[in-house]
């Protein structure tokens, strides 16, 4: 088993997103886990390790949060892991809110 090198643990999520190699972000997917430092995008779309990616998360308030990141790994026909690049204080605050909300959903009794 490989060692998990994350410094921030991801929480499970279900966030609609769009992504692509430019800000036009033509492909869609679902963020299924997220932390302040990165996320996993579930998609059948292709991504290459090291590729710069534009990502937009659909926030609960009904607006897009545009981010940029670098692909850490790709799992064919499953999705890719992304680390966020140079996020602003405002973007970090919004990501922290998303992570907190996802953590609360996880903790609810089934």
Annotate each predicted stretch with a short phrase.
Residues 31, 69-71:
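Conserved hydrophobic positions within beta-strands
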Residues 13-49, 54, 79-81:
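Short strand-loop-strand
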Residues 55-57, 92-95, 108:
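Short alpha-helical linear motifs
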Residues 1-34, 96-110:
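N-terminal helix initiation/capping motif
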Residues 65-67:
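PAS and PAS-like sensory/regulatory domains
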Residues 74-102:
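C-terminal structural segments of small proteins and small subunits
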Residues 39, 70, 106-109:
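Alpha-helical membrane-embedding segments
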Residues 58-63:
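Short, charged beta-turn/beta-strand-edge "cap" motif at the junction between a beta-strand
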